[in-house]
Design a protein with these regions (language model features):
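A glycine-rich dinucleotide-binding beta-alpha-beta segment and adjacent secondary-structure elements
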Residues: 231-234, 239-244, 411-496, 502
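Glycine-rich loop(s) and the adjacent beta-strand/alpha-helix scaffold that form part
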Residues: 24-32, 36-62, 241, 252-326, ...
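Conserved N-terminal glycine-rich FAD pyrophosphate-binding loop of Rossmann-like flavoproteins
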Residues: 38-79, 116-128
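FAD cofactor-binding and catalytic pocket of flavoenzymes
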Residues: 90-115, 289-292, 301-411, 417-419, ...
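Conserved redox-cofactor binding core of oxidoreductases
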Residues: 71-74, 79-91, 105-108, 112, ...
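N-terminal Rossmann-like FAD-binding beta1-loop-alpha1 element of flavoenzymes
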Residues: 4-33
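A conserved FAD-binding loop/helix module that cradles the flavin
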Residues: 495-516
Length: 525
């Protein structure tokens, strides 16, 4: 096909992967990317964590908050008056789906469910953790050799570094203490180590965190020919995917600045708008596979904060090492992440994904004079991520008779943990207590976060090996029964996982984009 047009719905790391891979393999193509939210940074899709000014960073995060956003409330047709939020407050840069106002979703069993509405999507706000899936987390119908290559390419696109902060002696001391506690129980290659992160280490020891901008790469470089073939339209809402039978013809879009609607013809449409809004768009377009919205999973998370014990730490690090760590941290005080360690998922010994993040301060205020409020050796914030095993009953459904705040069929989420998850949560909580005692003293006891807190929502457009009604997409991310409709994101992951899913979803997107490129006549395919 000569000069094909590809429409991409969503500007996060997954949509950006499709744009990059397709234009690199089909350079005569035209890619138009649509984003309902605003552009936050001069470089489209950059991580807001790279913004040095705290006020500017706060402004960027607020602009991402959809119905709660300030600067764009009225231009988006959202009342400027206060919206009453539900029981939980969304994380900075995100907005609750069930926010308590007119047109909010119904998610009492999944109350912390949230989204980001901005150029770069969650990639503008994420923690940049990029562990690889392992054991049963991997997709069984993708061959191991191909999977390893896909993960390798995903790491390149995201600028993954496996040893960020590895030169931190404080971080090394934390690893040593955890290894003493758990090392003998863990399989070879899956012991305590540094957490792979997406970003580029800087000479001063800080990190320039990766967002969708690094995935887009040459598409944002005005000197690159590929940039001439790429268009990003922010504040543009895709209302529907238009169909002619089982073939997509394009998308109906609304300019949120003017309210005007138009049709954009496309030879291929990629829907990568997140695990709730992508199936919502499909539903609104009349694309309604039996599995759409079902098999919702995330990661139950148990968290705590521990004050590091000076005597324990001094077994592996000196006061001079601590002073050097604090001096380095002073160079980037607005970024709370320093040394980041982990214990990866493994089976059957350790079906959890553990992150241990060092910080010289707690993530919450402490009254002066209270125990450990001024702990010289600092703190670690620890989290055990666990599996949610897929069930058809865990689902987001859509009501054609009740519009949400944007005029789409409104969402309702039904979700429950079972005895299977409860058992793993209990085991993880006990392990977290062991980890805390090995490092110091708890200043925040282990606690299970509300459902939806992980932001790692999966399964609602799951891929499958056969079209048997239990999946939405084929092994190359094409919606079953449609010739040129492709979906992307964490929603495609069909397995129970414990690790941060971004790297896995980018790898899946690379596979899907290569398949599309081949069918469009790519010379590289």
């Amino acid at each position: 096909m000569s000069n094909p047009t590809i429409a991409i719905v969503g500007s996060g790391p997954i949509g950006s992967t499709y744009a990059r891979v397709l234009l690199e393999r089909v350079p005569e193509a035209r890619v138009v990317m649509f984003e309902a939210g605003p552009q936050l940074t001069d470089v489209p899709g950059e991580s807001v964590r790279n913004i040095p000014d705290p006020d500017e960073k706060a402004r960027a995060r607020e602009m991402s908050q959809g119905p709660q956003a300030g600067a764009y409330r009225e231009t988006l047709g959202i009342p400027a008056a206060t919206v009453t939020e539900g029981m939980f407050t969304a994380r900075q840069g995100t907005h609750l789906l069930d926010f308590g106002g007119t047109g909010s979703a119904h998610a009492s069993s999944f109350p912390a469910a949230a989204a980001a509405t901005n150029v770069g999507g969650q990639g503008a706000h994420w923690t940049c953790a990029t562990p690889s899936p392992a054991f049963s987390e991997k997709i069984p119908f993708i061959p191991n050799e191909e999977w390893d290559e896909l993960i390798g390419r995903a790491k390149e696109l995201l600028h993954v570094h496996s040893a960020a902060f590895a030169d931190s002696t404080v971080g090394e001391a934390i690893r040593s203490l955890l290894d003493e506690e758990f090392g003998a129980e863990l399989p070879e290659g899956y012991g305590v180590g540094t957490l792979p992160v997406a970003g580029d280490p800087q000479p001063d020891g800080s990190v320039r965190w990766a967002g969708a901008d690094v995935v887009l790469g040459p598409l944002l470089d005005k000197d690159s020919p590929l940039s001439k073939q790429f268009e990003l339209r922010d504040l543009t809402l895709v209302r529907r995917v238009e169909l002619d039978g089982h073939r997509v013809t394009g998308v109906a879009v609304q300019d949120l600045r003017t309210g005007e609607t138009s049709f954009v013809a496309a030879d291929v449409v990629v829907v990568a708008a997140d695990a709730f809004r992508s199936p919502q768009i499909l539903w609104a377009s009349g694309v309604r596979p039996q599995a759409l919205g079902h098999y919702l999973t995330e990661h139950p998370v148990v968290i705590s904060t521990v004050a590091l014990d000076a005597e324990k730490m001094r077994r592996f690090a000196t006061e001079e090492d601590l002073a050097a760590e604090l001096a380095r941290r002073a160079l980037s005080p607005a970024d709370p992440v320093a040394a980041v360690n982990r214990i990866p998922f493994s089976e059957p010994e350790h079906p959890f994904s553990v992150q241990v993040m060092y910080s010289e301060s707690t993530p919450f205020p402490m009254e002066p004079g209270t125990p450990y409020s001024e702990n010289r050796w600092g703190y670690v914030n620890m989290g055990y991520g666990m599996r949610k095993h897929p069930r058809y009953e865990d689902a987001v459904t859509f009501d054609d008779d009740e519009p949400d705040y944007r005029g789409f069929p409104n969402m309702s989420i039904e979700y429950a943990l079972t005895e299977r998850e409860d058992a793993e949560i209990a085991e993880a909580t006990e392990r977290l207590r062991r980890a805390g005692k090995a490092l110091g003293a708890f200043v925040a006891e282990p606690r299970l976060m509300p459902n939806g807190s992980s932001l790692h929502y999966q399964g609602t457009m799951r891929m499958g090996e056969t079209d048997d009604g239990t999946s939405v997409a084929d092994p190359w991310s094409r919606v079953w029964g449609y010739e040129n409709l492709v979906v992307g994101g964490n929603a495609l992951i069909p397995t129970a996982t414990a690790m941060n899913p971004t790297l896995m979803s980018v790898a899946i997107a690379v596979r899907g984009a290569r398949k599309v490129a081949k069918e469009l006549g790519s010379e590289d395919a």
